[in-house]
């Protein structure tokens, strides 16, 4: 049986997959995202940046898999960033940065980009390497000063791409989206289905119900 490995510590991604019938093995990559970003050509399109990060994560996870998974599995690596006003933003990391991010994006529209990299492994050998980037337009509302302070104080926006969530407290301040909602949470279900099919497998093979 082919196993599904999620190369991410994101509870959002894990939750999306579980709600969609997949209970993956979770193996977290050890990629230094900041160092990798600093090494990339600054002229790279934003879609290519998140794709390269996702691919690096998938390869890192594949190199660390135990033997029982190496025999037959797929590894999914993902990376999400917000593209707004010509600039990519990842996780803000601090309350101050999260507040600045919201002050910039309130009342505007950005694009949440999620790079996906899928590796198929058989007997420890990578037989397929597939990848694509999902893009969803996000229309941000305008939280009041008190609401923004409370949101930042909750800690939620500090460790998520773009300083917002669609499926948590941040959802109160999202006026709408154009595109795939699961991509905003961190893993695009229809995109993963297409990547899986390119390896000769069907997504339904991984369903647990």
From Swiss-Prot:
Keywords: Cytoplasm, Hydrolase, Nucleotide metabolism. It catalyses: a ribonucleoside 5'-triphosphate + H2O = a ribonucleoside 5'-phosphate + diphosphate + H(+); a 2'-deoxyribonucleoside 5'-triphosphate + H2O = a 2'-deoxyribonucleoside 5'-phosphate + diphosphate + H(+). It is an enzyme of class 3 (hydrolase). One of its GO terms (cellular component) is cytoplasm. GO terms for molecular function: nucleoside triphosphate diphosphatase activity. InterPro entries: ITPase-like_fam (IPR029001), Maf-like (IPR003697). GO terms for biological process: nucleotide metabolic process. Its EC number is 3.6.1.9. It is found in: Cytoplasm. Its cofactor is a divalent metal cation. It holds the Pfam family Maf. The active site is at 79 (proton acceptor). Belongs to the Maf family. HAMAP family: Maf. NCBIfam families: maf. Nucleoside triphosphate pyrophosphatase. May have a dual role in cell division arrest and in preventing the incorporation of modified nucleotides into cellular nucleic acids. This is Nucleoside triphosphate pyrophosphatase.
């Amino acid at each position: 049986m082919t196993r599904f490995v999620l190369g991410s510590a994101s509870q959002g991604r894990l939750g999306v997959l579980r709600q969609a019938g997949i209970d993956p093995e979770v193996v977290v990559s050890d990629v230094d995202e900041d160092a990798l970003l600093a090494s990339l050509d600054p002229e790279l399109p934003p879609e290519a940046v998140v794709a390269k990060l996702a691919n690096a994560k998938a390869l890192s996870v594949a190199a660390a898999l135990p033997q029982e998974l190496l025999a037959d599995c797929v590894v999914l690596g993902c990376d999400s960033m917000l593209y707004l006003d010509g600039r990519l933003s990842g996780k803000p990391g601090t309350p101050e940065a999260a507040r600045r991010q919201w002050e910039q994006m309130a009342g505007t529209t950005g694009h949440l980009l999620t790079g996906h990299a899928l590796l198929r492994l058989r007997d420890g050998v990578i037989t397929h390497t597939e990848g694509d980037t999902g893009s969803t337009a996000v229309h941000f509302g305008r939280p009041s000063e008190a609401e923004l302070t409370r949101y930042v104080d909750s800690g939620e926006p500090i460790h998520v791409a773009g300083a917002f969530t669609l499926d948590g407290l941040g959802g109160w301040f999202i006026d709408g989206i154009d595109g795939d909602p699961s991509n905003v949470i961190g893993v695009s279900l229809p995109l993963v289905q297409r990547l899986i099919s390119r390896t000769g497998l069907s997504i339904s093979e991984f369903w647990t119900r």
